[in-house]
Curated annotation (Swiss-Prot):
The gene is cas1-2. Its EC number is 3.1.-.-. Its cofactor is Mg(2+); Mn(2+). It comes from the Bacteria. This is CRISPR-associated endonuclease Cas1 2. PANTHER family: CRISPR-ASSOCIATED ENDONUCLEASE CAS1, CRISPR-ASSOCIATED ENDONUCLEASE CAS1 1. Homodimer, forms a heterotetramer with a Cas2 homodimer. The keyword Lyase does not apply. InterPro entries: Cas1, Cas1_I-E, CRISPR-assoc_Cas1, CRISPR-assoc_Cas1_C, CRISPR-assoc_Cas1_ECOLI, CRISPR-assoc_Cas1_N. Signal peptide: none annotated. It comes from Chlorobaculum tepidum (strain ATCC 49652 / DSM 12025 / NBRC 103806 / TLS) (Chlorobium tepidum). GO terms for biological process: defense response to virus; maintenance of CRISPR repeat elements.
């Protein structure tokens, strides 16, 4: 945070007030995300500000934001990025309506203890399989997974998700021909698939920012592999049923098949807040990795 004071000769002097790690809110206390497009983020002497394409100015409380999703037509100054990093506010570059996740800016953390623990688990095949079982146990609380292999559990999950799609289609009386998404061909998808794609991309961004801020690596996964963010996809599967899948089918029915980007963004945001997603991520990682995470 910056403010102006008068120097000894009456001239304005800039005073930099350092924000310490201890004064920042924990991830669970932050607002999940803010999506911005067609504008500019910069800093003045008092705060981070957003200037939209109509020259409207909005102050951004970045210390209370988990991440900012930057859509098309956005620019951000070097100084603004520096202040957001100090406030532990993640930055993700996404496509229109958060449809595609492109990149993220990693905020610095005070130590690498959490990532070291994560790496040790992933490097040990037996322990990595234990972590995978704990992840699947969230979706199969009544199943005995003790002797199941990773391919077997992945097969169980595939069947569960396909059945879930069919149940949602029946529940909301929505036509369903299967999950389909081709990069660069978003408009070719049906409404339900469009909402699923948009919601999942936004979900990945939120989880990515939280994982970074807690000092874990998004690149070290236990179920997914061959992708750039396997740990993010591992975690996202815990929450998709509530924040993406049910939402997609219910909104398709509510909007009579039309794609209303503003309503989708609003309803997705409500779901994230209602289930207290940021309050769940930390404890869930603690349970999955068998370790109390470092405070953010």
């Amino acid at each position: 945070m910056k403010s102006n004071t008068l120097g000894d000769e009456g001239n304005p002097a800039r005073l930099l007030i350092k924000v310490t790690r201890e004064t920042l809110p924990q991830v669970k206390e932050k607002y999940p995300f803010l999506y911005l497009e067609k504008g500019r983020i910069e800093i003045d002497d008092s705060s981070i500000k957003w200037i939209d394409c109509d020259c409207n100015v909005v102050r951004l409380p970045v210390a209370m934001l988990n991440c900012i999703l930057l859509g098309p037509g956005t620019t951000v100054t070097h100084e603004a990025v520096k202040v957001m990093a100090a406030a532990n506010c993640g930055i993700c570059w996404v496509g229109d309506d958060s449809l595609m996740f492109y990149a993220s800016g990693q905020t610095p953390t005070s130590n690498t203890r959490n990532m070291t623990h994560q790496m040790k688990l992933a490097a040990n095949p037996a322990k990595a399989l234990e972590v995978a079982r704990r992840l699947f146990a969230y979706r199969f609380p009544d199943a005995n997974l003790e002797n199941k292999t990773l391919p077997q559990m992945m097969g169980m999950e595939g069947l569960r998700v396909r059945k879930l799609y069919e149940e949602m289609a029946v529940k909301y009386k929505v036509g369903w021909k299967g999950r389909r998404f081709e990069p660069g061909k978003f408009e070719m998808s049906d409404t339900t698939n469009k909402i699923l794609t948009a919601s999942n991309a936004a979900l990945y961004s939120i989880i990515l920012s939280a994982v970074h801020s807690m000092g874990y690596s998004p690149h070290i996964g236990f179920i997914h592999s061959g992708s750039p963010l396997p740990f993010i996809y591992d975690l996202a599967d815990l929450y998709k049923q509530q924040v993406s899948i049910d939402l997609a089918f219910s909104l398709t029915a509510d909007m009579a098949g039309y794609y209303d980007r503003h309503k989708i963004a609003s309803e997705f945001r409500k779901r994230v807040i209602e289930i207290d997603l940021l309050g769940k991520i930390g404890p869930d990682i603690e349970t999955i990795l068998g370790k109390k995470q470092c405070s953010s």
